Amino acid sequence: MRKLVVGSRRSKLALTQSQQFINKLKAVEPNLEIEIKEIVTKGDRIVDKQLSKVGGKGLFVKEIQHELFEKNIDMAIHSLKDVPSVIPEGLTLGCIPDRELPFDAYISKTHTPLSQLPEGSIIGTSSLRRGAQILSKYPNLEIKWIRGNIDTRLEKLQTEDYDAIILAAAGLRRMGWSDDIVTSYLDRDTLLPAIGQGALGIECRSDDEELLTLLSKVHNDEVAKCVTAERTFLAEMDGSCQVPIAGYATISDQKEIEFTGLIMTPDGKERFEYTMNGTDPVELGKTVSNKLKEQGAYEIIKRLNEQH
């Protein structure tokens, strides 16, 4: 096997994820020679704005995809939730490895459970999806935007006027934070995850047979089916970062997929949700999307997209 170059965002989390995946590859192919090339993306350069205000899909992947096309790198290791639902022609997701915990972590300054926070408590999050679901369940709380990496957010929780913050459990775990700092992991009934949350997507050129053969050795087919249902739903709903959208699929021992799709307004007041079981992930994603459109969810998406 030739020497491989892996493209990664420059953040600590991205580099850690990349190294962890490289270790996984070396476990099945010990003689691999792999180097990481750090790439700065548009999303990394914008640190002072709410990402949904910046607009556009693929804020964290476009520059990396460009490097793949230019053959400066052989593969890219993305957080799947950052990858738009349509992959450019000539590129492919070569594998979906094992999924980390897909839920969100709730961290309270005083370790107060979410349901017991006093009225007017301020929760920091960078996601419309989290904000909308929290306001829907706990309209007495306030949402305040927070940006920055995990360390920055944990520091802001202590030094600024946040009572709690919510962030992806997967990032905390991959960075080696212990469960001690987490007040609770929020289950799907409290906070339905983002599309592809906790999963990685390994992107490469579609014609790179040698690499695709290697990647197939660390591919998790069950996770791939689940995230395919989620990403199909995202594509069908035309969900952009202006829309609070969530979707989560699980697979049973009998290989049946259960998928829940959710669309909300940012204030949490309108909620469209549907759960369905099936065996074909693409059909499942499409059908749940159609059900939500019948309920009126598409009107919300059109309205929110037009406002930006």
From Swiss-Prot:
Which molecular function term from Gene Ontology is one that the record holds?
Answer: hydroxymethylbilane synthase activity
Kindly list the positions at which S-(dipyrrolylmethanemethyl)cysteine occurs in this protein.
C241
Entry EC number(s) = 2.5.1.61
Q: How is the cofactor bound?
A: Binds 1 dipyrromethane group covalently.
Gene Ontology terms: cellular component: cytoplasm
Superkingdom, natural source? Bacteria
Q: Does the keyword RNA-binding apply?
A: no
Read off the SUPFAM superfamilies from this record.
Periplasmic binding protein-like II (SSF53850), Porphobilinogen deaminase (hydroxymethylbilane synthase), C-terminal domain (SSF54782)
Arranged from A to Z, the UniProt key words for this protein are: Porphyrin biosynthesis, Transferase
Please give the pathway this protein is involved in: Porphyrin-containing compound metabolism; protoporphyrin-IX biosynthesis; coproporphyrinogen-III from 5-aminolevulinate: step 2/4
Question: GO terms for biological process?
Answer: protoporphyrinogen IX biosynthetic process
**Entries under Gene3D superfamilies matching the protein:** Periplasmic binding protein-like II, Porphobilinogen deaminase, C-terminal domain
- Named cofactor requirement(s): dipyrromethane
Record's InterPro entries? Answer: HemC (IPR000860), Porphobilin_deaminase_cofac_BS (IPR022419), Porphobilin_deaminase_N (IPR022417), Porphobilinogen_deaminase_C (IPR022418), Porphobilinogen_deaminase_C_sf (IPR036803)
Keyword check for Zinc-finger? no
Catalyzed reactions = 4 porphobilinogen + H2O = hydroxymethylbilane + 4 NH4(+)
Assigned protein family: Belongs to the HMBS family.
Description of how the protein assembles with itself and partners: Monomer.
Could you tell me what this protein does? Tetrapolymerization of the monopyrrole PBG into the hydroxymethylbilane pre-uroporphyrinogen in several discrete steps.
- NCBIfam families, A to Z: hemC
Other notes on this protein?
Answer: The porphobilinogen subunits are added to the dipyrromethane group.
Name the record gives this protein: Porphobilinogen deaminase
Organism, scientific name: Staphylococcus aureus (strain JH9)
Query: What is the gene name?
Result: hemC
